[in-house]
Amino acid sequence: MPRNPARIGLSGHPHRLISHEKEALIVPDVSEKKSVTYADAGVDISRGDRAKERIKFLAQKTFNRNVLGGIGGFGALYRLDMQRWKNPILVSSADGVGTKLKIAFELGQHHTVGADLVNHCVNDIAVQGATPLFFLDYLATGKLDPEVTEDVVSGLADACKANGCALIGGETAQMPGFYADGEYDLAGFIVGAVDRDKMVTGAGIKPGDVLIGLPSTGLHTNGYSLARKLLFEVAGYKPTQYVTAIKEKAGAALMKTHRSYLSVIQKLVTAGLTTGMAHITGGGITENLPRILPKNTGAQIETGSWPVLPIFEHLRDLGKVSEEEMMRTFNMGVGLIAAIPAAKFTRAKNLLDRAEEKFYVIGRVVKGEHRVQYT
């Protein structure tokens, strides 16, 4: 037995020896240790409070008369304007930015990912005829950086304001040990409204309807895991490296902001010129277009009827990616498809031309299998 068993412990730390009939337990003596705080565990509440103060001002810029209360309540309050809709249907969607964030981390470019998220969510409900009402975000990180958080939320707020949507709340989570240093995840939730008799569901789509495609700005928010593998692993590019094949830097090509189609969608819907619309996201045209097609109808898409962006051509060449894989992974330069009854096509064309909205006739709705055929 040591001379002073009460002072012997692991790693030289003092312990108390508690004797029992069958065994002796060594209990750490914490009387001399300092108090451990939440900040010691990696969660700095004061830093979080500073970030919230920065965020509050940005969010308030998006408020309208229907937002009740401010940022900081347990729940965000929004008044549904019953004079605006006779028989309102709420339409909601939730999404994230995906591994596009990895490029944002490397480039230190955080403002645009906020816009990516809002525009993606706006498009998802707008294709059903809904007007965006309010948006909430979720940002999680290992160690909170108030400046980065402000940059992200600034992008969210700017996009919300541009889409007529109020940023009424959200969650900023500090999760030490869960995320790598300097990284975060970002997700959003949107709610919009549409009168029941104005919903756009695709139920009215018929064989013979013309399919028009509206151009995308790039990958938008989908296919980034494959794109990153091809550009950064296979080709060995750096995000800041100029790539001759696409005539711009690799990172710049990948960080182009997800386009909002709200304005053009509202024009088509208000004029009663579309029977259904598809937001082309993960799964490409192959997976997304059938989501709006009625039973016993399919889509015939004419490849080559729209210009494929250089970034997609280069990705295909780098990985010898099959056409089938490309079409079900990327938007290939088409971010939105609208079905237009043949009898209304001229009116739709004139409307889009007046609005200076570029579009391409990319195919037709056909009778038959519920799938996309490429010709």
Predicted segments — roles?
Residues 1, 8, 18, 26-30:
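Short hydrophobic transmembrane-like helices used for membrane targeting/insertion
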Residues 57-217:
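Glycine-rich phosphate/pyrophosphate-binding loop regions near the starts of catalytic domains
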Residues 48, 84-85, 97-100, 195-198, ...:
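Short, acidic Gly/Pro/Ser/Thr-rich loop/turn segments
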Residues 205-233, 237:
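Mobile "lid/hinge" segments at catalytic clefts and subdomain interfaces of large enzymes
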Residues 26-40, 57, 148-166, 179-186, ...:
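Glycine-/charge-enriched secondary-structure boundary and capping motifs
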